[in-house]
């Protein structure tokens, strides 16, 4: 959430910066609400001062033996007006808060300006796509050949956009997740966490999924209890660990990593990536989250992105790194890098990780703070998150990039210890 003080003092500047994201801020409505708020607040404060004076007069009139009934009636009338003013102020503030919750973050000055993914800027590439000397098969054909990737049974169980993995491919999927977690914990300094897969609405509001993106979530309504939502990413549960907390500066940076299933309705993805595992309602992901001091968040974004890239490098998967433009960034981000891995059957790079610095945007929504050692006062932390990596899409990339002419799959060297030394599957 943006700082309401910034919005009041630099409304047009904020609107101009948001316009670069394709977001039209309703400046007129905000100005009208602010004017209403000031008017009601001024009137209420004047009325309160008058009521206090009348209340004081009652005591004085009583001492003089005068009739206090008219004064009492005035005070009672003012109390009613004050109560009505309070209700009016609360209604105005509720609408302002609702508007604030729907405003995306302001892009960092280093973010390229653009309308959509065509405005993204390639930062670097790593690896060279393999030139196969045989017809390339996609991951669906490779997996179904041996009955290890079963979309038909998954559809019988759950409907479209689900997958059933069996045998060596299920083991390879597990190996990938274990490899990623171990790398981030032992070499990148993250603390592993096992988190709930169901969260309440305030957690999703804290990270920015609610209220704007509720249609993308799976919701479990409960009578007499708070509704629960299946997490769309472990970013939600990991980041909210510090919600409502004041962290000692000596604890920073805090670095969490978790391997969880993720659940998304893919409400806006009708007709896109309907074949295979690229876009699923349920998929596994290894998620990294960092909680840092404000002055260190841009540096942390570079290291977070490097941590995700290391996974791809050790797996020997060609990829490219993109700086997302203003029009393609996620709701909560001030700056984002996307990693795209090479998918041979599609002859192009596909997103496999998104690494974002959210500044104090999520922290303000969550009231996550640290105590500044210089001032002794609480200040908002900065939060970052990134996929390290999406396990299903990494499996797709391994199957396709390590395929052989007979349809078998070579096991990447770094995964062999997790596969019992197995070198080839199929």
From Swiss-Prot:
PROSITE patterns: AA_TRNA_LIGASE_II (PS50862). L-serine binds at residues 233-235, 287, 387. The keyword Cell wall biogenesis/degradation does not apply. SUPFAM superfamilies: Class II aaRS and biotin synthetases (SSF55681), tRNA-binding arm (SSF46589). InterPro entries: aa-tRNA-synt_IIb, aa-tRNA-synth_II, aa-tRNA-synth_II/BPL/LPL, Ser-tRNA-ligase_type_1, Ser-tRNA-synth_1_N, SerRS_1_N_sf, SerRS_core, tRNA-bd_arm. Pathway: Aminoacyl-tRNA biosynthesis; selenocysteinyl-tRNA(Sec) biosynthesis; L-seryl-tRNA(Sec) from L-serine and tRNA(Sec): step 1/1. Pfam families: Seryl_tRNA_N (PF02403), tRNA-synt_2b (PF00587). It catalyses: tRNA(Ser) + L-serine + ATP = L-seryl-tRNA(Ser) + AMP + diphosphate + H(+); tRNA(Sec) + L-serine + ATP = L-seryl-tRNA(Sec) + AMP + diphosphate + H(+). Its EC number is 6.1.1.11. It is an enzyme of class 6 (ligase). Keywords: Aminoacyl-tRNA synthetase, ATP-binding, Cytoplasm, Ligase, Nucleotide-binding, Protein biosynthesis. It is found in: Cytoplasm. One of its GO terms (cellular component) is cytoplasm. Homodimer. The tRNA molecule binds across the dimer. HAMAP family: Ser_tRNA_synth_type1. Belongs to the class-II aminoacyl-tRNA synthetase family. Type-1 seryl-tRNA synthetase subfamily. Catalyzes the attachment of serine to tRNA(Ser). Is also able to aminoacylate tRNA(Sec) with serine, to form the misacylated tRNA L-seryl-tRNA(Sec), which will be further converted into selenocysteinyl-tRNA(Sec). This is Serine--tRNA ligase. The lineage of its organism: Bacteria, Pseudomonadati, Pseudomonadota, Gammaproteobacteria, Pseudomonadales.
């Amino acid at each position: 959430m943006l700082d309401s003080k910034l919005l009041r003092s630099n409304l047009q500047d904020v609107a101009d910066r948001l316009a670069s994201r394709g977001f039209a801020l309703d400046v007129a409505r905000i100005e009208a609400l602010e004017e209403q708020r000031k008017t009601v607040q001024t009137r209420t404060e004047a009325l309160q001062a008058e009521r206090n004076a009348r209340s004081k007069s009652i005591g004085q009139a009583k001492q003089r033996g005068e009739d206090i009934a008219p004064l009492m009636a005035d005070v009672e009338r003012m109390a009613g007006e004050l109560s009505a003013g309070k209700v009016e102020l609360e209604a105005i503030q509720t609408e302002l808060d609702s508007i604030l919750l729907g405003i995306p973050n302001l892009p960092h000055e280093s973010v390229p300006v653009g309308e959509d993914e065509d405005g993204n800027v390639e930062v670097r590439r790593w690896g060279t796509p393999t030139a196969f000397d045989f017809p390339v098969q996609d991951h669906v054909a490779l997996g179904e050949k041996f009955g290890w990737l079963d979309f038909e049974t998954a559809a019988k169980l759950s409907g479209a956009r689900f997958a059933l993995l069996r045998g060596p491919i299920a083991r390879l999927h597990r190996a990938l997740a274990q490899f990623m977690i171990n790398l981030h914990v032992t070499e990148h300094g993250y603390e592993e966490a096992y988190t709930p897969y169901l969260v309440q609405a305030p957690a999703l509001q804290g990270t920015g999924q609610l209220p704007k993106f509720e249609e993308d979530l799976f919701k479990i309504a409960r009578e007499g209890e708070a509704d629960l939502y299946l997490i769309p990413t472990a970013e939600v549960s990991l980041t909210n660990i510090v919600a409502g907390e004041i962290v000692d500066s000596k604890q920073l940076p805090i670095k969490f990593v978790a391997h969880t299933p993720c659940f998304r309705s893919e409400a806006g993805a009708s007709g896109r990536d309907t074949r295979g595992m690229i876009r699923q309602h349920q998929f596994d992901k290894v998620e990294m989250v960092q909680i840092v001091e404000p002055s260190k968040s841009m540096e942390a974004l570079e290291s977070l992105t490097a941590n995700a890239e290391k996974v791809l490098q050790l797996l020997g998967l060609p990829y490219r790194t993109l700086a997302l433009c203003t029009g393609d960034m996620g709701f909560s981000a001030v700056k984002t890098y996307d990693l795209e891995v090479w998918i041979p059957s599609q002859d192009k790079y596909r997103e496999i990780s998104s690494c974002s610095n959210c500044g104090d945007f999520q922290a303000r929504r969550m009231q996550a703070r640290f105590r500044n050692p210089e001032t002794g006062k609480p200040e908002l932390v900065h939060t970052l998150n990134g996929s390290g990596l999406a396990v299903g899409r990494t499996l797709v990339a391994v199957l396709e990039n390590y395929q052989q002419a007979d349809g078998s799959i070579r096991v990447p060297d770094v995964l062999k210890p997790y596969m019992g030394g197995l070198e080839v599957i199929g």
